[in-house]
A protein has these predicted regions:
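Short, low-complexity N-terminal leaders and the immediately following helix N-cap/first helix
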Residues: 1-68, 322-343, 348
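Helix-rich terminal scaffold detector
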Residues: 1-7, 166-297, 301-307, 318
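Short, glycine/charged-enriched hinge/interface segments at domain edges or termini
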Residues: 2, 17, 41, 57-217, ...
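Conserved active-site and cofactor/substrate-binding residues in soluble primary-metabolism enzymes
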Residues: 2-9, 25-28, 32, 46, ...
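Generic secondary-structure signature for well-ordered alpha-helical cores
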Residues: 12-23, 38-39, 43, 133, ...
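Flexible glycine/proline-rich
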Residues: 24-26, 30-31, 53, 258-407
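Short, hydrophobic/aliphatic alpha-helical segments
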Residues: 34-47, 78-90, 136, 281-286, ...
C-alpha cells in the first residue's frame, strides 16, 4: 500500500476532480431551480421590503385625530402622500404606507363617527415594515454552493429574481458486480444478498446526485461485463459512475483492466484509510468533450461507505461548487471510550452520539458488516500512528442521515 494517497490528500484530490469535470452553470427559471445548487451568491437586488408596508389593516394617519378620511390604499397600489395633519387613508395589510404617515391605527381599535371622521389611539409600536428591514440592497443572503430549496426560491422571488444561475445535480449510475450476489430473497448456498445496490443510490441522492432508478446488476463478473456496463452508463450521459466490488488487482478482479482499456486516468488509486481498502476515483473521457467520474467502491458494505465518504462526497461537493473540504473544520467530538489506530492508515471508526454529544465506538463494525453503520452518526477520525483514548477530542465525519445534511 505504499502507493496509497493519504486520507486528507485523497479528499482534496477528489474535490478538485469534481470541480474540474463539472459543466458550466446554467440559468433556470425559479420554477425549475428547486433541488439544484446556487452557482453564485444570492444577493438582494433591492431593499427587502422595497418600500414601507403596513403590517395590519387599519388607518394610516397624519398628526393628531380625529382624522378625515381622504382615500383608501390597497396592496399593489402606490398612494399619494398624506399632506396635511388630520388626514388619513384606509390601509390594507401589505399595502404601501403613504409618505407623511405618522402612525397606523388598527381597524379593530378605531371608531368611525357619524361625520365620517376616524378616532382611535395608535399603539406605541410602529405598525409597518421599513425598507431594508429584512435585507438591504446588495446584501448576500446565501452563498454559492447553497442547495436551492423551496424557501430559497421564494426568497429569490421576493428579491426580484426571475431566474437563478445554478449548477445542475450530477447524474449518477450505480453498477453492482459480483457473481456471489443475490438481488432478492434469503442468502444461502454460497450466495449473499446485495446490500450495496439498494443503499448506494440512496446515499448518492442525499449527497446531491440524481440517480434514475435502482442500481444496475449484479452484472457479469468478467472483463467483458465490466466494459459493457461502464460504457453503457457513460454513453447514457452519466456524470458519475459508482461501481461496487473488484477494486483489488487479483486474477478475478476486472475493474482496473476495464478502466485501462477504456482510457481512464486515475485521480486516486486507493487511499490510506481503514476500512475502505482498496478504493479508486478516475476520470473517463466521454462524447462531446465531456468527462465523467468513475468511483470504484469495495465490495464490502462498510468499506464501500468509507469510499463514498472519502472520494464521492468531496467529488460531488466540487462538482456542485461547494467549498473545498477541510478536515480541520470537521466537528469535534469527545470519545466515551478508546479507539485503536490502524498503523500508517487513517482509521474511520463508526460512532454513535449521546444527547450530550459524547461519541461512543460501535460494535459490529467489520468491513463486511452493516449493523454498526445502521446506528452510526458518523466516523471518528483517528490519525495515522496513534490510538485514541476515552476523553480525547477527535474530528468526526458526520453521515448524511437526512437529505441535504451533507451541505
Amino acid at each position: 500500500m505504499d502507493h496509497a494517497t493519504d486520507w486528507a490528500g485523497a479528499v482534496r484530490a477528489a474535490w478538485r476532480a469534481g470541480r474540474d469535470t463539472a459543466p458550466d452553470p446554467v440559468a433556470l427559471g425559479l420554477a425549475d431551480a428547486d433541488r439544484h445548487v446556487l452557482a453564485e451568491p444570492l444577493v438582494t437586488r433591492t431593499d427587502l421590503p422595497a418600500f414601507p408596508t403596513s403590517s395590519v389593516d387599519g388607518w394610516a394617519v397624519r398628526g393628531e385625530g380625529p382624522w378625515r378620511v381622504t382615500g383608501q390604499v390597497l396592496a399593489g397600489a402606490q398612494p399619494p402622500p398624506l399632506d396635511a395633519d388630520g388626514d388619513c387613508v384606509e390601509i390594507a395589510t401589505g399595502a404601501m404606507v403613504p409618505a407623511g404617515t405618522t402612525a397606523i391605527v388598527r381597524v379593530e381599535e378605531s371608531t368611525t363617527g357619524g361625520d365620517g371622521r376616524v378616532t382611535g389611539r395608535p399603539r406605541d409600536k410602529r405598525e409597518w415594515r421599513e425598507p431594508g428591514e429584512e435585507a438591504a440592497a446588495g446584501e448576500a443572503l446565501a452563498p454559492a454552493g447553497s442547495p436551492v430549496t423551496p424557501a430559497l426560491v421564494g426568497l429569490a422571488a421576493a428579491c426580484g429574481y426571475d431566474e437563478l444561475l445554478v449548477r445542475r445535480r450530477p447524474r449518477a449510475e450505480v453498477l453492482v458486480f459480483g457473481d456471489e450476489l443475490r438481488s432478492a430473497g434469503l442468502p444461502g448456498q454460497g450466495r449473499v444478498r446485495d446490500a450495496l445496490g439498494p443503499q448506494v443510490p440512496a446515499w448518492l441522492r442525499r449527497l446531491g446526485a440524481d440517480v434514475d432508478g435502482p442500481a444496475v446488476g449484479p452484472g457479469t463478473d468478467t472483463l467483458e461485463g465490466h466494459l459493457r456496463a461502464i460504457s453503457l452508463a457513460r454513453d447514457k450521459g452519466a456524470d458519475l459512475i459508482c461501481t461496487t466490488g473488484g477494486t483489488m488487482r487479483g486474477p478475478v478482479d476486472h475493474l482496473h483492466p476495464a478502466l485501462a482499456e477504456l482510457g481512464t486516468t486515475y485521480v486516486v488509486d486507493t487511499a490510506a484509510v481503514r476500512p475502505g481498502f482498496p478504493m479508486l476515483l478516475a476520470t473517463l473521457p466521454a462524447a462531446g468533450r465531456r468527462t465523467c467520474l468513475v468511483a470504484g467502491l469495495p465490495g464490502n458494505p462498510q468499506s464501500a461507505v468509507v469510499a463514498l465518504v472519502t472520494l464521492v462526497t468531496p467529488a460531488l461537493a466540487g462538482w456542485l461548487g461547494r467549498p473545498p473540504p477541510d478536515p480541520r473544520a470537521l466537528p469535534q467530538v469527545r470519545l466515551g471510550a478508546g479507539i485503536p489506530g490502524r498503523g500508517r492508515d487513517t482509521h474511520l471508526a463508526l460512532v454513535r452520539r449521546d444527547p450530550d454529544g459524547t461519541a461512543h465506538p460501535l460494535p459490529h463494525t467489520g468491513s463486511a458488516m452493516l449493523r454498526g453503520l445502521a446506528r452510526a452518526a458518523g466516523f471518528a477520525v483517528i490519525v495515522p500512528g496513534s490510538d485514541a483514548r476515552a476523553g480525547d477530542v477527535v474530528p468526526m465525519v458526520p453521515l448524511p442521515l437526512f437529505p441535504w445534511e451533507a451541505s
